[in-house]
Amino acid sequence: MAKVSKRLAALKATVDRNKLYPVDEAISLVKGAATAKFDESIDVAVNLGVDPRKSDQVVRGSVVLPRGTGKSVRVAVFTQGANAEAAKAAGADIVGFEDLADEVKKGNLNFDVVIASPDAMRIVGQLGQILGPRGLMPNPKVGTVTPNVAEAVKNAKAGQVQYRTDKSGIIHATIGRASFDVEALRENLGALVDALQKAKPAASKGVYLKKIAVSSTMGVGVRVDQVTLVAQA
Protein backbone atom coordinates (compact mmCIF):
# COMPACT_ATOMS: atom_id res chain seq x y z
CA MET A 1 0.00 0.00 0.00
CA ALA A 2 2.90 2.33 0.79
CA LYS A 3 4.33 1.75 -2.69
CA VAL A 4 1.00 2.67 -4.25
CA SER A 5 0.75 5.82 -2.14
CA LYS A 6 4.29 6.88 -3.10
CA ARG A 7 3.55 6.22 -6.75
CA LEU A 8 0.35 8.28 -6.67
CA ALA A 9 2.11 11.10 -4.85
CA ALA A 10 4.80 11.14 -7.53
CA LEU A 11 2.18 11.19 -10.27
CA LYS A 12 0.26 14.03 -8.66
CA ALA A 13 3.47 16.04 -8.45
CA THR A 14 3.82 15.92 -12.25
CA VAL A 15 0.32 17.24 -12.94
CA ASP A 16 -1.12 20.68 -12.22
CA ARG A 17 -4.72 19.88 -11.28
CA ASN A 18 -5.85 23.40 -12.17
CA LYS A 19 -4.13 23.63 -15.55
CA LEU A 20 -5.86 22.97 -18.87
CA TYR A 21 -3.51 20.85 -20.95
CA PRO A 22 -3.56 20.61 -24.76
CA VAL A 23 -5.29 17.33 -25.61
CA ASP A 24 -2.19 15.53 -26.92
CA GLU A 25 -0.13 16.60 -23.90
CA ALA A 26 -2.90 15.52 -21.51
CA ILE A 27 -3.10 12.10 -23.13
CA SER A 28 0.70 11.75 -23.16
CA LEU A 29 0.85 12.58 -19.44
CA VAL A 30 -1.80 9.98 -18.67
CA LYS A 31 -0.08 7.34 -20.82
CA GLY A 32 3.28 8.10 -19.22
CA ALA A 33 1.78 7.69 -15.76
CA ALA A 34 0.19 4.33 -16.63
CA THR A 35 3.00 2.19 -15.24
CA ALA A 36 0.98 -0.62 -13.68
CA LYS A 37 1.83 -4.20 -14.65
CA PHE A 38 -1.31 -4.46 -16.80
CA ASP A 39 -2.61 -2.50 -19.78
CA GLU A 40 -4.51 0.20 -17.91
CA SER A 41 -7.76 1.63 -19.22
CA ILE A 42 -7.74 5.25 -20.32
CA ASP A 43 -10.88 6.86 -18.96
CA VAL A 44 -12.57 10.21 -19.39
CA ALA A 45 -14.88 12.16 -17.10
CA VAL A 46 -16.97 14.91 -18.68
CA ASN A 47 -18.82 17.35 -16.43
CA LEU A 48 -21.96 18.50 -18.21
CA GLY A 49 -24.05 21.60 -17.56
CA VAL A 50 -27.24 19.67 -16.88
CA ASP A 51 -29.49 19.01 -13.91
CA PRO A 52 -29.65 15.19 -13.81
CA ARG A 53 -32.53 15.35 -11.31
CA LYS A 54 -34.73 16.44 -14.20
CA SER A 55 -35.67 13.68 -16.62
CA ASP A 56 -35.42 15.98 -19.64
CA GLN A 57 -31.77 16.71 -18.83
CA VAL A 58 -30.48 13.15 -18.47
CA VAL A 59 -27.89 12.55 -21.19
CA ARG A 60 -27.79 8.94 -22.33
CA GLY A 61 -26.68 7.21 -25.48
CA SER A 62 -23.90 5.28 -27.16
CA VAL A 63 -21.11 5.87 -29.64
CA VAL A 64 -18.85 3.56 -31.62
CA LEU A 65 -15.27 4.63 -30.96
CA PRO A 66 -13.33 4.79 -34.26
CA ARG A 67 -10.27 3.06 -32.76
CA GLY A 68 -12.18 0.62 -30.56
CA THR A 69 -11.84 0.15 -26.82
CA GLY A 70 -9.09 -2.46 -26.71
CA LYS A 71 -11.47 -4.80 -24.94
CA SER A 72 -13.11 -7.89 -26.39
CA VAL A 73 -16.77 -8.16 -25.42
CA ARG A 74 -19.12 -11.12 -25.33
CA VAL A 75 -22.50 -10.26 -26.80
CA ALA A 76 -25.78 -12.01 -25.99
CA VAL A 77 -28.81 -11.47 -28.23
CA PHE A 78 -32.44 -12.15 -27.40
CA THR A 79 -34.18 -12.78 -30.72
CA GLN A 80 -35.57 -15.53 -32.92
CA GLY A 81 -36.05 -16.61 -36.53
CA ALA A 82 -34.13 -14.81 -39.26
CA ASN A 83 -32.84 -12.27 -36.75
CA ALA A 84 -31.19 -15.07 -34.79
CA GLU A 85 -29.28 -16.21 -37.86
CA ALA A 86 -28.31 -12.62 -38.68
CA ALA A 87 -27.05 -12.08 -35.12
CA LYS A 88 -24.90 -15.21 -35.30
CA ALA A 89 -23.49 -14.17 -38.66
CA ALA A 90 -22.61 -10.76 -37.20
CA GLY A 91 -20.55 -12.38 -34.47
CA ALA A 92 -22.91 -12.71 -31.50
CA ASP A 93 -21.52 -15.07 -28.86
CA ILE A 94 -24.88 -16.21 -27.48
CA VAL A 95 -28.26 -16.12 -29.25
CA GLY A 96 -31.54 -17.32 -27.81
CA PHE A 97 -35.06 -16.55 -26.70
CA GLU A 98 -36.87 -18.31 -23.84
CA ASP A 99 -33.92 -20.69 -23.52
CA LEU A 100 -31.51 -17.78 -23.01
CA ALA A 101 -33.86 -16.25 -20.44
CA ASP A 102 -33.81 -19.54 -18.53
CA GLU A 103 -30.00 -19.47 -18.48
CA VAL A 104 -30.02 -15.91 -17.14
CA LYS A 105 -32.44 -16.92 -14.39
CA LYS A 106 -30.01 -19.68 -13.41
CA GLY A 107 -27.29 -17.09 -13.01
CA ASN A 108 -25.41 -17.85 -16.21
CA LEU A 109 -24.35 -14.36 -17.25
CA ASN A 110 -21.32 -15.05 -19.40
CA PHE A 111 -21.64 -11.89 -21.48
CA ASP A 112 -20.82 -8.18 -21.37
CA VAL A 113 -23.55 -6.71 -23.60
CA VAL A 114 -27.19 -7.69 -24.11
CA ILE A 115 -29.09 -6.86 -27.29
CA ALA A 116 -32.76 -7.60 -27.94
CA SER A 117 -35.16 -7.33 -30.85
CA PRO A 118 -38.42 -5.54 -29.93
CA ASP A 119 -40.43 -8.78 -29.95
CA ALA A 120 -38.10 -10.23 -27.31
CA MET A 121 -38.70 -7.48 -24.76
CA ARG A 122 -41.71 -9.27 -23.30
CA ILE A 123 -39.22 -11.92 -22.17
CA VAL A 124 -36.28 -9.65 -21.38
CA GLY A 125 -38.54 -7.37 -19.35
CA GLN A 126 -38.98 -10.19 -16.84
CA LEU A 127 -35.22 -10.25 -16.28
CA GLY A 128 -34.95 -6.64 -15.14
CA GLN A 129 -34.05 -7.47 -11.54
CA ILE A 130 -31.12 -9.57 -12.78
CA LEU A 131 -29.87 -7.53 -15.73
CA GLY A 132 -30.66 -4.03 -14.45
CA PRO A 133 -28.31 -3.86 -11.44
CA ARG A 134 -25.48 -5.13 -13.66
CA GLY A 135 -26.04 -2.47 -16.30
CA LEU A 136 -27.02 -5.11 -18.85
CA MET A 137 -30.66 -4.24 -19.48
CA PRO A 138 -31.23 -3.47 -23.19
CA ASN A 139 -32.51 0.02 -23.97
CA PRO A 140 -33.50 1.66 -27.27
CA LYS A 141 -31.74 4.89 -26.22
CA VAL A 142 -28.37 3.18 -26.48
CA GLY A 143 -29.25 1.06 -29.50
CA THR A 144 -29.52 -2.28 -27.73
CA VAL A 145 -33.23 -2.72 -28.39
CA THR A 146 -33.50 -2.71 -32.16
CA PRO A 147 -35.01 -4.65 -35.07
CA ASN A 148 -31.55 -4.60 -36.67
CA VAL A 149 -29.77 -6.84 -34.19
CA ALA A 150 -26.97 -7.65 -36.62
CA GLU A 151 -25.88 -4.01 -36.81
CA ALA A 152 -26.09 -3.71 -33.02
CA VAL A 153 -23.85 -6.76 -32.63
CA LYS A 154 -21.29 -5.32 -35.06
CA ASN A 155 -21.30 -2.00 -33.19
CA ALA A 156 -20.78 -3.71 -29.84
CA LYS A 157 -17.90 -5.75 -31.23
CA ALA A 158 -16.38 -2.70 -32.94
CA GLY A 159 -15.98 -0.75 -29.72
CA GLN A 160 -19.28 0.86 -28.83
CA VAL A 161 -19.42 2.55 -25.45
CA GLN A 162 -22.57 3.51 -23.62
CA TYR A 163 -22.77 6.68 -21.57
CA ARG A 164 -25.16 8.19 -19.07
CA THR A 165 -24.94 11.13 -16.68
CA ASP A 166 -24.51 10.14 -13.06
CA LYS A 167 -26.29 11.93 -10.21
CA SER A 168 -23.70 14.73 -10.38
CA GLY A 169 -24.15 15.31 -14.11
CA ILE A 170 -20.87 13.61 -15.02
CA ILE A 171 -20.30 11.18 -17.89
CA HIS A 172 -17.73 8.43 -17.29
CA ALA A 173 -16.42 6.36 -20.19
CA THR A 174 -13.41 4.32 -21.29
CA ILE A 175 -11.76 5.51 -24.50
CA GLY A 176 -9.05 2.89 -24.86
CA ARG A 177 -5.96 1.40 -23.26
CA ALA A 178 -2.58 2.76 -22.25
CA SER A 179 -1.07 0.75 -25.13
CA PHE A 180 -3.00 2.89 -27.65
CA ASP A 181 -1.05 5.68 -29.31
CA VAL A 182 -1.93 9.33 -28.66
CA GLU A 183 -3.67 9.74 -32.01
CA ALA A 184 -6.00 6.78 -31.41
CA LEU A 185 -6.98 8.02 -27.96
CA ARG A 186 -7.51 11.55 -29.26
CA GLU A 187 -9.78 10.26 -32.04
CA ASN A 188 -11.81 8.22 -29.56
CA LEU A 189 -12.11 11.15 -27.16
CA GLY A 190 -13.20 13.40 -30.02
CA ALA A 191 -15.87 10.91 -31.09
CA LEU A 192 -17.26 10.73 -27.55
CA VAL A 193 -17.32 14.51 -27.11
CA ASP A 194 -18.98 14.92 -30.51
CA ALA A 195 -21.67 12.41 -29.50
CA LEU A 196 -22.25 14.27 -26.23
CA GLN A 197 -22.60 17.56 -28.10
CA LYS A 198 -25.24 16.02 -30.36
CA ALA A 199 -27.05 14.61 -27.31
CA LYS A 200 -27.29 18.01 -25.58
CA PRO A 201 -30.77 18.36 -24.03
CA ALA A 202 -32.81 21.34 -25.21
CA ALA A 203 -33.43 22.20 -21.55
CA SER A 204 -29.70 22.55 -20.80
CA LYS A 205 -28.76 26.20 -20.29
CA GLY A 206 -25.39 27.92 -20.04
CA VAL A 207 -22.08 26.12 -20.54
CA TYR A 208 -22.74 22.50 -21.56
CA LEU A 209 -19.25 20.95 -21.67
CA LYS A 210 -17.93 22.28 -18.37
CA LYS A 211 -14.87 20.11 -17.78
CA ILE A 212 -13.09 17.21 -19.48
CA ALA A 213 -10.46 15.16 -17.66
CA VAL A 214 -8.61 12.02 -18.72
CA SER A 215 -6.98 9.46 -16.44
CA SER A 216 -5.73 5.89 -16.36
CA THR A 217 -6.98 3.10 -14.10
CA MET A 218 -4.28 3.68 -11.48
CA GLY A 219 -3.39 7.27 -12.38
CA VAL A 220 -4.48 10.82 -11.72
CA GLY A 221 -6.85 13.06 -13.66
CA VAL A 222 -5.51 15.53 -16.22
CA ARG A 223 -7.76 18.33 -17.43
CA VAL A 224 -8.11 18.86 -21.19
CA ASP A 225 -8.26 22.22 -22.93
CA GLN A 226 -11.37 21.83 -25.08
CA VAL A 227 -10.15 24.38 -27.61
CA THR A 228 -7.28 22.06 -28.57
CA LEU A 229 -9.64 19.11 -28.89
CA VAL A 230 -11.73 21.01 -31.44
CA ALA A 231 -8.60 22.19 -33.25
CA GLN A 232 -7.33 18.62 -33.60
CA ALA A 233 -10.67 17.29 -34.91
Curated annotation (Swiss-Prot):
Keyword rRNA-binding appears in the UniProt entry: yes
Xref: InterPro entries: Ribosom_uL1_bac-type, Ribosomal_uL1, Ribosomal_uL1-like, Ribosomal_uL1/biogenesis, Ribosomal_uL1_3-a/b-sand, Ribosomal_uL1_CS
Keyword tags: Repressor, Ribonucleoprotein, Ribosomal protein, RNA-binding, rRNA-binding, Translation regulation, tRNA-binding
PROSITE patterns according to UniProt: RIBOSOMAL_L1
HAMAP family: Ribosomal_uL1_B (MF_01318_B)
NCBIfam families, A to Z: rplA_bact (TIGR01169)
Function: Binds directly to 23S rRNA. The L1 stalk is quite mobile in the ribosome, and is involved in E site tRNA release.
GO MF, one example: rRNA binding
Any one GO BP annotation for this protein: regulation of translation
Family: Belongs to the universal ribosomal protein uL1 family.
GO cellular component: cytosolic large ribosomal subunit
Source organism superkingdom: Bacteria
Protein name stated in the entry: Large ribosomal subunit protein uL1
PANTHER family: 54S RIBOSOMAL PROTEIN L1, MITOCHONDRIAL (PTHR36427), LARGE RIBOSOMAL SUBUNIT PROTEIN UL1M (PTHR36427:SF3)
UniProt-listed CDD domains: Ribosomal_L1 (cd00403)
Keyword Ribosomal protein attached: yes
Subunit structure: Part of the 50S ribosomal subunit.
SUPFAM superfamilies: Ribosomal protein L1
